Amino acid sequence: DNDKQGDHGSHVTGIAAGNRYIEQADGSFAPALDTALTQGVAPDAQVYTMKVFGKGGGAYDSDYMAAIEDAMILGCDSANLSLGSGNPGYSRQSDAKYQAILEAVVNSGMVVAMSAGNSGHWFENTPYAYPYAESVSWASNGSPGSYTNSLGIASVDNVGSTGNYIEFAGTKMFYNDTSEAPIQPMTALAGEQRFVYVDAVGNPEDFAAAGDELKGAIAMCNRGSINFTAKGNNAVAAGAIGTIVVNNAAGTINMSTDGYTGTAPYVSLTLADGQIIKANAEKKEANGVTYYVGKLTVGAKPGVNVQTADYYTMSDFSSWGIPGSLELKPEITAPGGNIYSLQNGGGYQNMSGTS
């Protein structure tokens, strides 16, 4: 995957078929689970990639239906569709030709897994007029995952965390890094570092309130009001050696760093991690701005944190059933929130979705 449009495809492919062994710098091979902390569910499986989206995004049903048919003809054991309509989907495809393809898939024995969608709860979509006016259903799962002959997949959050992290107050906090070269990875700052967490959105005056304390430290600020590029540029201009944006809602952030002029590391943390930092750091105030200072440790390599839980919790983005046919949809729920897998350029990252 050498395009610049994102690395969702690489991430999903790594989950499905990531290699069992990875070549090392000396030419030897080592187990992926030991060196990269991840491998595919079906490691080393052959993967066919079928492009159905245009450069500007969006896919026609004729394109992905043709891809399903091609996969069946080629003898694929399974197919994955990381796509779906934003509005609640119907139970059957209205086009007889498409319905025939779906029925042929069932008879062929090929398993076709389709995302139930990332539309979340029904009420989250009402401002966008996605639910049909005449509908009394609270379903939000889109087509083709809503079709009778599809296998719709919903998402639960991972009970553990894998990836690069910072550590503070005895807690490993796994950050999300969506930046690319020439921006340095956060691991370039491995070891103990000072931080200044400005409890504001990252305007120039927000960082200025911390004065010289920010110089040579990692800057932290909250998501909101201004774009991610401005936050990072403002932090670097104030003397920060790296920037961390804390989410203002549950979940992770897939930040766009287009326009970021610095090379200093730029990553994001969850709201929950930000709250832990504020609760355990030294609190200060200047010019009407509250900020927190302390020292954290940047991990030099990926780590694992397995949390104790009696059960999984549904991902807040996962679409809900049930379609108009009253069939059990989606059929399967599996971990899709905060999954560690491939990133473009030979790296690894956490991403979330129902794919």
What name fits each language-model region?
Residues 1, 108-112, 116-330, 344:
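Structured lumen-facing ectodomains of secretory-pathway proteins
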Residues 1-60, 74-77, 107-109, 146-150, ...:
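Subtilisin-like serine protease catalytic core
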Residues 2-5, 345-354:
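Short pre-catalytic strand/loop immediately N-terminal to key active-site residues, enriched for Gly-Thr
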Residues 11, 76-86, 103-118, 240:
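Divalent metal-dependent hydrolysis catalytic cores, especially in the metallo-beta-lactamase
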Residues 28-36, 62-67, 135-139, 312:
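Alpha-helical scaffolding within the catalytic cores
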Residues 54, 68-92, 115-116, 216-217, ...:
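Short acidic, glycine-rich surface-loop motifs adjacent to enzyme active sites
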Residues 60-61, 66-73, 77, 87, ...:
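Hydrophobic, small-residue-rich alpha-helical packing segments that form membrane-like cores
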Residues 333-344:
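Active-site-adjacent bridging/hinge elements
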